[in-house]
Each structure stands twice: as C-alpha cells, then as structure tokens.
Amino acid sequence: MAAIRPRDLLSDGLLERLGGTSLAARAAAGGDTPAILSRDIAKLGEVGYLNVALPPEFGGLGCTLRQAACGQRRLARSAPLTASVVSAHLYWTGAAADAYRTGDNSVRWILLEAARGALFAGGHATAGGDLHFADPHSRCEPAGESGYRFRDPAVLASMTPAWDWVAVHAVHWVPSPGAARPDAVLAFAGRGSRCTPAFRIARVQPAGSPADAFTTSAIAWGHAILASVQYSDARRAFNAAVAAIDPVPAAPAGGHPLDQWPVAEAGLRLDAMKAKIAEITHPWPLVPEQDPDLGGQRLIGIFTMRHEVAEGAARVLDLTSQIASAPAIAAR
C-alpha cells in the first residue's frame, strides 16, 4: 500500500483550479471543453496524479486499486468530467502494474510509456455492444509481421483531448475446422492509426470472459474507478440538493415523510454504493495462483458492483429532484 495516497496529491487549492465541472456550467460560461480538460490533465500530471498506479521503480506511488478509487472519488466531487477522462489512463496503468508484479512483462511497455508522460485512453466500446471485453463488435485482420488492422473503429470513451495511445479491442475469426469462437485481440494504437504492431498487442485469447491477471485486473480497475466517479457525481448532486432546501422547525403534530423519505433513501443508497465499491477494491492486486477463479465469481462480483452503483446513482439523482422540489424540510 502506497505511503502517499492518490488523494493526498489533490489539494483543495488544486481542485479549485480545475475546470472539469459540469457540461451545463461550462456551456453557460462559454468554455472550450477540450482545452479546459487538456489544462486539467496537465495540472494533474504536474502533481504526479496520473502516475499513482505505477510501481515506485517506474516513478509512481504503487497505489492499490482501493487507493486509486478513493482518489477518483475526491477528484470527481470537484471536477467530474476531468475524473472521467483520466479514468482509462488509471485503469490501464493499474492493470499493467498488477501484471508486472506477478512477473508478467508483456505489458511492461505501458508502464515505461506512462513513466515518460504518455497518456492512455479507452476505446474498446463499440456501437451496439455492451459487453466490451467479452463480446466486442469490432473486427480486425492480420497486417504486417504479427500485427493487426482494425476495420471499424471503436468508440473513444475517454482522454479525448490528450491521449497518446488508445486501447482497441476486436475479434478475429481464424478459419479452421476446430475454431468454435474467434480470438479477441486487445491492443493499443497511436493517433491516426488503425494498425497495431506486434509489440503493442496486449492479449490475443479466445473471445469470452477474461481469465488472466491483466485483463481481469483491467476490468476490476476500470469498473471500480468509473463506479467511483458515478458515486461522487451522485453524492455531489445529493449534497447540493440538501444544502439548497430551507429547514423549518418541526410541527408538533407529526412528521413530514413525503419530504424526509427521499433524503433518507438517497443517503442509504449512497452508503450502500460506497460499501460495494470498497468490497470489490479491497482484495486487489490479486496473484493468479492465490485466486484461480479470476474469470468466474470474481468477475460476477465486479459486474454486480458496477450495476448496483449505476442503478443506485440513477435513483439518487431521481431522489434529488424530489428533494429539490420540496419547499422545506422539517428539522429534527
């Protein structure tokens, strides 16, 4: 566990200078979103926040997934858009660090690139595909010496203003009598390229549930970090709604449940979301020999956490509308 936590790098003064607040606020101010986010990313890089997951020998803090998720929650409370766009960089470097600690040097280059300042984006989402790693809709074909060309680009989901490498994920059908399912190819492409050379291919394995340390860690880091951003966004909306209401003395003849219940339910859901994230992030990093079921129950727990946080955040945002519409809340 890192002695200096990621959240320790995010001083109050730094958070106040970040511009990645809400889209509505930026639109009202006439701001240039890509330029603002690029400046935010540069500020986070200056304090070392983008390298928190790198092992110390690569110039990072060597933080755990739980520490990284905690840092993202703090960042998202002040600048949710900025937290969202740096999420992919954190989960790719975090997964690469997990693999490196197990003796797997196949993605060590990610750590080296990040140490020199390169930024990684997530682009494995595909239009109409919601399983991403397990069932990509993009297709690829061999190109050059052991490389691949990606025929239809994926959706660039993060780091849009500033990335150097983007993760691309696609399937490749191998024409053979015994091929029951295609290979899934996870690789990284540079700007303006649809091809990846062999040394930038992270994994080629049968399509389906990932079962190795790197891909499973990438899923764990990705879902936990993005869920942390969702949680903080919901918490921020809840806090703002409660702060805006007008507390009044309670009437002698009973309570006001229609006003008070949404506050109570939202608070309970937020507590449950935070606890679920903590439950999933606590055991990472994992060593495959200690947890042979990387692609089974462990994945189910990760997806359950993400679903519960997404549903909980949506419900909290609905409840904040009810809270904000209440004329007053009886003080107890």
Question: Where do the model's predicted regions map?
Answer:
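Intrinsic disorder at enzyme termini
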Residues: 2-7
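N- or domain-start disorder-to-order transition segments that initiate the globular core
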Residues: 8, 12-15, 19-33
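Short, structured patches in soluble enzyme cores that scaffold and shape functional sites
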Residues: 124-126, 142, 154, 169-172, ...
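A short core secondary-structure module
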Residues: 153-193
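Glycine-rich beta->alpha junctions and the first turn(s) of the following alpha-helix
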Residues: 196-270
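Generic structural signal for well-ordered, non-transmembrane alpha-helical segments
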Residues: 232, 264-271, 303, 307-314
